[in-house]
Amino acid sequence: MKLLRSYYLLCKPNVVYMMLICALVGMLLAEDSVSSITTIMVALLGIALCSGSAAAINQVIDRNADAAMTRTDQRPIPQGDLSALHASSFALVIGVLGALILYFYINTLTMILTLASLIGYAFIYTVYLKRATPQNIVIGGLAGAAPPLLGWSAISNTIDPYALLLVLIIFVWTPPHFWALAIYRKDEYAKESIPMLPVTHGVAFTKLQIVLYTIILFIVSVLPYIVLMSGFVYLISAITLSSLFMYYSIKLYFSDDDAVAMKTFNFSIYYIFLIFVALLCDHYLIQ
């Protein structure tokens, strides 16, 4: 039982769940009515397996850094519950399985986009960007922003502009989300020589960037209404949620308490979840 739990934790389940929610939103927005439940479940399974594979590869590559950081030292590999070889083999198996499911039961486009996201996160971000530039989150964030597009393409077999707009929302949301956490964990990142923005440019500069990105996010979040993708209910929700995010970011900017950074980080998770819920409610409940 402990071994199964170790493999489960290797996949970063909380991250995968959030990605699946975003993918599901893309699926449900791709059509005016709910598609085949079977198609949705199979697509989510394929995306989940590939996402879990990417997370496992990330933990294999980052195992030494994970062992040295309080936030990650309880992961299966640093704890000795899994070897790097076994974790790598597991990642390969579920990654291939997920890709095959998408190829044979969904469509080739979704498989290609999902594998591109896997490669972007597991290799381009983890191997290179994470330790190469303080803009690692900005550049690498595209891979993490892909789930709505994956879900949309699973239903429509197209790359739709509306799906790309959902990707843009997550892409702009990602830097303030992670930089808030990076402020709270800056000493650990510095110890491992990981060039997160608070380490390379200081906390004050990072706080300013968080404020600027939340302003940009405010603008981007209302675009679905402007392009007639959504209605008034979503607009009110987006304005309210984005205003709250800006409140937290401004509060963080003027605070010397790192705990405020963690509160900002936690709110950002609620933000992205609720704004997508608002999109769904507007799409299906308000006709």
Language-model features: where?
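Juxtamembrane boundary at the C-terminal end of a transmembrane helix
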Residues: 277-287
